């Protein structure tokens, strides 16, 4: 039993996170030097994200009997994303207005260090809707894979899958090659995942070592408010959606616990993307649905990021005594409905979108970003965890709506009743 526990990726990552926190707190200089360990692990994951998405989407689409099903899946997914993301934005807006974590700070925007957030403000200038849409189209196929742009790879994979499907029996050889290549890629993922504890230790030690626990205390009310909001969203909103779909949100969270710990350690939901593709398929969702919903959700269904954006924007307004009446808040909501779709599931992207939103709204000081710059890294964990759970739930819901969900398999796996007597997980 003890040997099995020590070999568990769940236990190893949890232990690594605890060691990272202690190391960063008591030896901050050493903690800061651990950053390459976390960065290196995330880079290894990013290295195989593009081929994983390509293989999953191509084999999923090419293996379908009807192409109409693909279009229906995409339409249902986008509708679900828009509804749930809007709910997340509204919940964040309501709670930050009720709690008012920034009230009474009376910060003068002129005294804030605008240079500290200049890099985010500059990047935010390129976050327009037209620029976002054009960025989905790659300049070249090789460029899409080289940059690791999820939506660009997804677009090419969908087109490739359609074309391969039209070839019929002539394309069987190509289909078999891609399917075999997919198995090799997932073998690489299993090898990389053995390094997850090292990556989590390095990332957590760096975060605590660089920013310190004192930063948490200074703006603790906003952090606590945000974490509680994310928990309520997962339990109440996603929990209700899960119950209506026929499964327990708590059993689902238990099923993806290792992925959640990896995300907790790296602060990026992208680090768990390859494993989520595999685990959602093993949960009973058809490969074509998983291949479309999960990658697309990383830009269009970021529930945690949506909550963060409304809360952070209103917090800055409260702290700087900027006017934020109902008209301004509705304007903010409309802007965020568009700008939040440009936030990829990587560390720091939410901060860039927030800068773009403040610029678009106009009357909120962009320099106010300096107020939350130090604690943004601590809130990124809750964002990433909520995003991951949200995309997992979305996949099951969409699969059910388009009748591509194996309900018995879903129930068996979540209740540890797999036919082979094992839980459906990647090896650790």
UniProtKB/Swiss-Prot annotation:
Protein name: C4-dicarboxylate transport protein
Pfam family, one: SDF
This protein's UniProt keywords: Cell inner membrane, Cell membrane, Membrane, Symport, Transmembrane, Transmembrane helix, Transport
Highest taxon of the lineage: Bacteria
Cell location: Cell inner membrane
Residue stretches spanning the membrane: 8-28, 44-64, 76-96, 142-162, 184-206, 222-242, 326-346, 352-372
Any one Gene Ontology cellular component term annotated for this protein: plasma membrane
GO molecular function: fumarate transmembrane transporter activity; malate:proton symporter activity; succinate transmembrane transporter activity
Functional description taken from the UniProt entry: Responsible for the transport of dicarboxylates such as succinate, fumarate, and malate from the periplasm across the membrane.
InterPro entries xrefs: C4_dicarb_transport, Na-dicarboxylate_symporter, Na-dicarboxylate_symporter_CS, Na:dicarbo_symporter_sf
A GO biological process held by the record: L-aspartate transmembrane transport
Family, per entry: Belongs to the dicarboxylate/amino acid:cation symporter (DAACS) (TC 2.A.23) family.
Membrane topology type: Multi-pass membrane protein
